[in-house]
Amino acid sequence: MCESKTAAAVVKKQKDTGTWGGNLLGLAPSPAQGIKDVGTIPNYRRLLQLEWPRTGRPFKLADRVLFRLLSRDEDPALLFELQKLVKSDPEASIWAREIIREAASAALAEAGYAEDPRLRGAGHKIASSISQFLRSPVADKPFVKSGKAIALHPEAHPPSWYSVAMIAAMPNLRRERAGFTERLGHYLAQPAPKKPFVIQVGKRSIKPQHLLLGDPIEADAKGYPKDTPLALHYIELLAQMGALEWAPVATRVLARLLKDCDETGVWSPKNLRSQPKALNKITYHYYPLHLDANTTEGREVDITFRLALIAKLLGWQLDYA
């Protein structure tokens, strides 16, 4: 994959500082947030998915930045795109640094740093915050009214796409905290709330894109997912954690997708006229890896690859044609 135009295009956009787009978390350009391009952490994770060599210069440069984000360094510059928010509202500082550390931890865990003491320390701290939430009554009633809106309880610290990705990529942490991992798996298997909600960040109300209050997969009665890339990403995380069996919607969607595989294991649904589209930007790093969708075979590649990877994570025997 490292020679692909897709990976080369990602590398080309990296600055000498090790960052991308002048920001950390941006999943797409956002003039309102001052984000001109996709940020450092999504692009770093995308390079990992594209199998760019870990010893390469892009990772060496970015690793320095990510490990610094895990530290207790209070340098305002490390807030990147959230710096303006915190400057105008200092109460938002704790939230900003927490989300940045979670995202950086996910990226470093996926990069193979699971046993690095710096990441282990951050990982256990993140896991402890989630564990405290899961054990509290707030986990069952996580919302409060805030004027006309529904807001997340101020004491709620639910898992996020970042923290779950980190935990999924840290097998020893999961073994050391087996009880927590099981509680988290059951929590992630329940349906996510349907109603939109906001979180209070300092004096502002923000619509969160990163939090997971249950299984986010939406599927019809036949098991077809509304957002196939998001469904596969979530199923893959649950499979890594050994929690897929507890998630009824996720298992139903996986079964439906597998039904569309032919005798050689290739995902080939009828009348596939276009590549499944990602509706949620959270899967930017994950999908698509194969951009050529001009042929039927090209449209099948990504989903086939993900289904094979999930099968491998589940311990299934794969026969390659």
Where are the regions a protein language model picked out?
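Preference for long, amphipathic alpha-helical scaffolds in soluble/luminal domains
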Residues: 1-321
